[in-house]
A protein has these predicted regions:
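N-terminal cap/lid segment of alpha/beta-hydrolase-fold proteins
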Residues: 1-15
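Conserved HGGG/HGGXW glycine-rich cap/lid loop of the alpha/beta-hydrolase fold
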Residues: 17-74
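Active-site loop/oxyanion-hole signature of alpha/beta-hydrolase fold enzymes
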Residues: 63-109, 113
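Conserved hydrolase catalytic core segment
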Residues: 100-144
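Flexible "cap/lid" loop of the alpha/beta hydrolase fold
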Residues: 127-168
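Alpha/beta-hydrolase
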Residues: 158-238
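Conserved loop-alpha-helix segment in the C-terminal half of the alpha/beta-hydrolase fold
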Residues: 223, 230-273
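Catalytic active-site module of serine/aspartate enzymes centered on a nucleophile-bearing elbow/loop
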Residues: 265-297
Length: 297
C-alpha cells in the first residue's frame, strides 16, 4: 500500500488541497517527484489517482485541486479565474512543499498552465515535462473542434451552431449534441467497474470553467480565449514529451504544432484514445511516462 499524505495550502481567500502519494518503504526514493496539473479549469485531481502507480517506480506523486474546484472549491469571485491566479497557486504549492527538482505533467488546461510555467517562469526546478492532450493556442483549439464537429450528424451540427449564434447553451438539442461530441472525443460514460476515483462524485468548478474558458470545449470566450504560446515554444529547453490520442480533442494538428516548435520534443500518439489517454489505454500510458521519467531524472 502507498502512504498518502493530504494537506492544505492557504491561498488567497481560500485554501488549496493537495495529495501526495509516497513510494513504499524499501524502494529507491531518490527520484524526482512528479506534479500533476489537472484540466478544466475546474476538473479536480480525482482522475489522476489512476496514476498513483507512478509511485511504484520510487517517486512521489503530487496532485492538487486547483483553486475553484474539488476540495479547493471557491466561487462568487469571477475576477480570480485567470492564468495569473493559477500560476501563483502552482508556485505557492512548489514553495510550500519545498520542491527544488521535479517533473511536471499537465493534461488539457493543466498543460496550458505547464507551458506558461516552462516559458514565463523559466522552467525553474523542472527535470522534464509531459504535455498530455493539451494546447498552445486556444484559437487553434477552437478551430480544430469546429472542424471535427462537421463529422457529427447534420442535426447535431445545427443544434451547436444555433446555440453559438444565440448564446443559449441550455437548449435540449444542443446539450444532447454536446454530450455526443464529448463522448466521441473526451470520455464516455463511467461504467460501474471503472476505478473508484472516476466514479466518485466531484465538485467541479463550473464558474471557473465558464469564466476562464467558456460554455464548452469549442467556444473559448473567457479569460483564456487569447492564450497563445505557439510562437514562444522555442524558448522551452527542458525535455518535453507530448501525448495525444487519435480521437482526442487535442487533434494531431494541435499536438504537432507543439512538437514542431519545442526543441527536441518527443510525441506519442495513442491509437484509439480520446482526451484521457491515461484512462483509455492506462497500461501503455503508464509504461510510456514511467520510461520517460526514468530517462530524465
Amino acid at each position: 500500500m502507498y502512504k498518502i499524505t493530504e494537506g492544505y495550502l492557504p491561498f488567497l481567500s481560500g485554501r488549496t488541497y493537495y495529495r501526495i502519494v509516497e513510494p513504499q518503504k524499501g524502494t529507491d526514493t531518490a527520484k524526482a517527484p512528479i506534479i500533476l496539473l489537472h484540466g478544466g479549469p475546474g476538473s479536480t485531481h480525482n482522475y489522476f489517482e489512476v496514476l498513483d502507480c507512478f509511485a511504484d517506480d520510487g517517486r512521489a506523486v503530487i496532485s492538487y485541486d486547483q483553486i475553484g474546484c474539488g476540495k479547493s472549491y471557491l466561487d462568487g469571485q469571477p475576477q480570480l479565474w485567470t492564468l495569473d491566479t493559477w500560476m501563483r497557486e502552482l508556485k505557492a504549492l512548489i514553495r510550500h512543499l519545498g520542491l527544488t527538482k521535479f517533473h511536471l505533467l499537465g493534461q488539457s488546461w493543466g498543460g496550458m498552465l505547464e507551458l506558461a510555467y516552462l516559458i514565463d517562469e523559466g522552467a525553474q526546478g523542472v527535470c522534464s515535462a509531459v504535455l498530455s492532450s493539451t494546447l498552445s493556442s486556444s484559437q487553434l483549439w477552437g478551430r480544430e473542434q469546429h472542424r471535427m464537429i462537421r463529422y457529427l450528424p447534420e442535426e447535431e451540427q445545427q443544434a451547436i451552431a444555433e446555440a453559438e449564434a444565440s448564446g443559449n447553451y441550455q437548449d435540449r438539442r444542443y446539450l444532447q449534441a454536446n454530450d455526443h461530441y464529448m463522448e466521441l472525443h473526451c470520455m464516455g460514460k463511467v461504467s460501474a467497474d471503472a476505478p473508484e476515483c472516476l466514479r466518485r462524485k466531484k465538485v467541479t468548478g463550473d464558474e471557473a470553467y465558464r469564466t476562464a474558458w467558456g460554455p464548452n470545449e469549442y467556444t473559448p470566450l473567457g479569460t483564456l480565449r487569447n492564450f497563445d504560446y505557439t510562437d514562444r515554444l522555442g524558448e522551452i529547453h527542458v525535455p518535453c514529451l507530448i501525448i495525444s490520442g487519435t480521437d482526442d480533442l487535442c487533434t494531431p494538428l494541435v499536438a504537432k504544432t507543439m512538437y514542431d516548435r519545442i526543441p527536441d520534443a518527443h510525441w506519442e500518439l495513442f491509437e484509439g484514445c480520446r482526451h484521457m489517454c491515461f484512462v483509455d489505454d492506462h497500461a501503455k500510458y503508464c509504461t510510456v511516462v514511467e520510461k520517460w521519467l526514468r530517462e530524465n531524472d
